[in-house]
Amino acid sequence: MPVKKKRKSPGVAAAVAEDGGLKKCKISSYCRSQPPARLISGEEHFSSKKCLAWFYEYAGPDEVVGPEGMEKFCEDIGVEPENIIMLVLAWKLEAESMGFFTKEEWLKGMTSLQCDCTEKLQNKFDFLRSQLNDISSFKNIYRYAFDFARDKDQRSLDIDTAKSMLALLLGRTWPLFSVFYQYPEQSKYRVMNKDQWYNVLEFSRAVHADLSNYDEDGAWPVLLDEFVEWQKVRQTS
């Protein structure tokens, strides 16, 4: 989860690099070597007071964990801000804005996770990652990411932010991702709305990499119809 400098900034969820003329995303998406978490005794019960004190280690005077606090928090737990585990954590905290945790979000979410210190959260990393392997949970995380990443004064995601979030969520698992990633560069699309966003996930799950089972009469958004048409032309050229 990238650290935003302003609440209104869309942020970027993945670093992108040139490779052989095609843009490939370099994302620390599912794992990164973290310092081993200290084993927590089963007798150390969750403490709301301790959780609140932990929050104030990172919060500013406005009682919000902002960019600087988020950077320190990520350093302490041993996770890069753009690691997908931060998106899953934000989902668990029901955070509204990328790069920010309010006190209410922190206390509600960490209470749900029963985490009141760094070590307990590190011991939850495997659980957080497991949410990505559950079809229902992943769908919820994917849908959450749209509102989480968009500017709150906009109804759609700008296309660069959409591409970065798609890279984070689908870059490792969708065979057509690298092709779809290139498509907006030569298309008319500069934003992605919620319906398009939702349907990209369904498309990635339902349609074969060779597009052989794509139903032109299906209820897909025009964006995906045009993507398929564009890709078929490329395949035959």
UniProtKB/Swiss-Prot annotation:
Coiled coil: none annotated. Residues 46-232 form the DCUN1 domain. GO terms for cellular component: cytoplasm; nucleus; spindle; ubiquitin ligase complex. PROSITE patterns: DCUN1. Keywords: Cytoplasm, Cytoskeleton, Nucleus, Phosphoprotein. It is found in: Nucleus; Cytoplasm, Cytoskeleton, Spindle. One of its GO terms (molecular function) is ubiquitin-like protein binding. InterPro entries: DCN-prot (IPR014764), DCN1-like_PONY (IPR042460), PONY_dom (IPR005176). GO terms for biological process: DNA damage response; positive regulation of protein neddylation; protein neddylation; regulation of cell growth; regulation of protein neddylation. Part of a complex that contains DCUN1D5, CUL1 and RBX1; this interaction is bridged by CUL1. Interacts (via the DCUN1 domain) with the unneddylated cullins: interacts with CUL1, CUL2, CUL3, CUL4A, CUL4B and CUL5; these interactions promote the cullin neddylation and the identity of the cullin dictates the affinity of the interaction. Interacts (via DCUN1 domain) with UBE2M (N-terminally acetylated form) and probably with UBE2F (N-terminally acetylated form). PANTHER family: DCN1-LIKE PROTEIN 5, RP42 RELATED. The DCUN1 domain, also known as PONY domain, mediates the interaction with different cullins. The DCUN1 domain mediates the interaction with the N-terminally acetylated NEDD8-conjugating E2s enzyme leading to the NEDD8 transfer from N-terminally acetylated NEDD8-conjugating E2s enzyme to different cullin C-terminal domain-RBX complexes; the neddylation efficiency correlates with the DCUN1D5-cullin and DCUN1D5-E2 interaction affinities. Contributes to the neddylation of all cullins by transferring NEDD8 from N-terminally acetylated NEDD8-conjugating E2s enzyme to different cullin C-terminal domain-RBX complexes which is necessary for the activation of cullin-RING E3 ubiquitin ligases (CRLs). May play a role in DNA damage response and may participate in cell proliferation and anchorage-independent cell growth. This is DCN1-like protein 5. It comes from Pongo abelii (Sumatran orangutan). The gene is DCUN1D5.
